[in-house]
């Protein structure tokens, strides 16, 4: 048995989960928020109870030290020697990383170089890695990339119709994201279906504030809705998803905004927030629609119709699907959104049960037993995938 920490470091946050492996028992989990501010928040779950502390955590190194101290103070580990490995979520692995990898100096340099492709995320992920290296330098650490799962996409899926030299010189192509989540839920779907994943064609719908759809054939990603960045694809909470690229200079001309300002609008003020004018949260928007708000209705219609585009496209690509999976915050918890996405898909063999669909945050088949295409709700677990990869690559006994 070995204890493994799964880490997701943001620019001002640190999410953690400690596992006993290989049993995959969660020993504790928590979150450090507002790092760098005087009123940082440290939350940890001990014996099923949340402990919350507001204190000054100036940087990630202090957050890591505090986390490790809490583990021993609360008796979750007797000593730090019990920690056998650390897994770090890294958003962008580019074309360099098609799998998770043991972190060494070369890997760190590669992640840094790839920061060009994910300027908001990779630098923060690096800070988390370095903070742990300072405190636990001899513990094996593994980088788990959001993009790695999608490295199996064929050129026909990942190339943009741009001058080929842009791809060769600048790495401009579709990378895709949420890979760890799509991998987890498709592998779990194969288990639930009782069939080898190699025999399955699956549609994975990761619907949260960020959202992406993936076509997974034989356990391999063959296409996904996000692109060079997580801005592409379906309509999201605050992100536009796909738009006509010529709109960017047009908006600049009309508003006097810089390209950076327009891109910021596309990332932070568009999507459901842009369409409604008041919220990126689907629960608020559904409530407003029930009150008769027209823009709420239109926003929800746009959200669903963009998902339909990918379901239709990927079903054609795979010549049919065996199952559609719903995961992430909205996919796991919104029966209304699932129902709207599935309505009218009988032509492709989808027959879902409204009663079975009334589930929230738990695994369930929501299709009728006779439905040729199975519909499954699967709560995602990116942290356990990270822990599994640490166990696989870290030579941990």
Curated annotation (Swiss-Prot):
EC assignment: 2.7.2.1
Record-annotated site: Transition state stabilizer: 178, 239
InterPro entries per the UniProt record, alphabetical: Ac/propionate_kinase, Aliphatic_acid_kin_short-chain, Aliphatic_acid_kinase_CS, ATPase_NBD
Gene3D superfamilies found in the cross-reference section: 3.30.420.40
Pathway: Metabolic intermediate biosynthesis; acetyl-CoA biosynthesis; acetyl-CoA from acetate: step 1/2
Reaction catalyzed: acetate + ATP = acetyl phosphate + ADP
Active-site feature positions: 146
Sorted UniProt keywords: ATP-binding, Cytoplasm, Kinase, Magnesium, Metal-binding, Nucleotide-binding, Transferase
GO terms assigned for molecular function: acetate kinase activity; ATP binding; magnesium ion binding
Essential cofactor(s): Mg(2+); Mn(2+)
Binding site residues for ATP: 15, 206-210, 281-283, 329-333
Binding site for substrate: 89
Cofactor note: Mg(2+). Can also accept Mn(2+).
UniProt-listed NCBIfam families: ackA
Classification via HAMAP family: Acetate_kinase (MF_00020)
Subunit field text: Homodimer.
PANTHER family according to UniProt: ACETATE KINASE, ACETATE KINASE-RELATED
Function: Catalyzes the formation of acetyl phosphate from acetate and ATP. Can also catalyze the reverse reaction.
UniProt name for this protein: Acetate kinase
Annotated source species: Bacillus mycoides (strain KBAB4)
Native organism taxonomy: Bacteria, Bacillati, Bacillota, Bacilli, Bacillales
């Amino acid at each position: 048995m070995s204890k493994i920490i799964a880490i997701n470091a943001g620019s001002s946050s640190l999410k953690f989960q400690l596992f006993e492996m290989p049993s995959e028992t969660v020993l504790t989990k928590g979150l450090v928020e507002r790092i760098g501010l005087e009123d940082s928040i440290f939350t940890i779950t001990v014996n099923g109870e949340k402990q919350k502390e507001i204190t000054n955590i100036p940087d990630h190194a202090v957050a890591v030290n505090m986390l490790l101290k809490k583990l021993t103070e609360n008796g979750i580990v007797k000593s730090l020697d019990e920690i056998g490995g650390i897994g770090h979520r890294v958003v962008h692995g580019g074309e360099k990383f098609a799998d998770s990898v043991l972190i060494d100096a070369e890997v760190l340099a590669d992640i840094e170089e790839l920061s060009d492709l994910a300027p908001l995320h990779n630098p923060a992920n690096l800070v988390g890695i370095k903070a742990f290296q300072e405190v636990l330098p001899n513990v094996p650490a593994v980088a788990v990339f959001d993009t790695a799962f999608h490295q199996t996409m064929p050129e026909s899926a990942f190339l943009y119709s741009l001058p080929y030299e842009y791809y060769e010189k600048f790495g401009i192509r579709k990378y895709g994201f949420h890979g760890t989540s799509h991998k987890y839920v498709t592998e779990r779907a194969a288990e639930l279906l009782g069939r080898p994943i190699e025999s399955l064609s699956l549609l994975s719908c990761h619907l949260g504030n960020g959202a992406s759809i993936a076509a997974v054939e034989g356990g391999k990603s063959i296409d996904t809705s996000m692109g060079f960045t997580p801005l592409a694809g379906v309509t999201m909470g605050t992100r536009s998803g796909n738009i006509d690229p010529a709109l960017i200079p047009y908006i600049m001309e009309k508003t006097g905004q810089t390209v950076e300002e327009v891109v910021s609008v596309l990332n932070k003020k568009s999507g459901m927030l842009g369409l409604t004018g008041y919220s990126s949260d689907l629960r608020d928007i559904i409530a407003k629609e029930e009150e008769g708000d027209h823009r709420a209705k239109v926003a929800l219609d746009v959200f669903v119709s963009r998902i339909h585009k990918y379901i239709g496209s990927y079903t054609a690509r795979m010549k049919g699907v065996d199952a559609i999976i719903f995961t992430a915050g909205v996919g796991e918890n919104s029966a209304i959104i699932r129902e709207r996405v599935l309505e009218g898909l009988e032509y492709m063999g989808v027959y879902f049960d409204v009663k079975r669909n009334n589930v929230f945050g738990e695994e369930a088949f929501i299709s009728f037993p006779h439905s040729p295409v199975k519909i499954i709700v699967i709560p995602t677990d990116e942290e356990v995938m990270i822990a599994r990869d640490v166990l696989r690559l870290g030579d941990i006994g």
